[in-house]
Amino acid sequence: MNIGFISLGTSQADLKTDSTSWGNYENNAWSITNANLKYSTDHGDNWTTATEKSNISKSGILLSTGADDSFSKMGIYDLAGNEWEWTLEYNSNPYNPCTHRGGRCYFSGSDRPADSRGSYFSTTETPVFRVALY
C-alpha cells in the first residue's frame, strides 16, 4: 500500500538518512544524462532526442518529463517546482529539523532550482502557485 509517494515499507531510519529508492531528492539513485535531453526546431511543436553532438541550441532544450520509467511514481510526473514543499528528509538544524525542497517563484539564484534544499519555520506562510498538466 502506498500513501502519496512513500511506501509504507520505508523504514524511519531510511527517511532520516537515505532517500535513494523512494524520492526525487538530492541523493537519488538515478542520474540525468544527455540521453534525457530533447530539442525543438519548430518552437516546441515537435521534439527530437538530443545527443552530446546534436545541435541543441536551435530553439531550446527540454529535460523530458518521464525520460524513463524511474522518473514516474504512480504515473505522475514532475510535481516539483515554483514553491517550497516539505519532504520527509531530516537536516542538521536542531530548530528546524525537517527539510523543504524547491525554489519559490519570487526567489532567484541558488534558492530557485527545484533541487535546492533548506530548512525554514513550518509556520511560514507565503502565497504560491503551481501549474499542473496531465
Predicted regions and their residues:
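Short, well-ordered surface patches within globular domains
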Residues: M1-L63
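Compositionally biased, intrinsically disordered low-complexity regions
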Residues: I6, S11, Y25, N46, ...
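Short, solvent-exposed loop/turn segments at the edges of secondary structure
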Residues: T17, Y25, L79, Y95, ...
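Structural recognition of the beta-strand scaffold that forms the well-ordered cores
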Residues: G75-D78, E83-W86, R130-V131
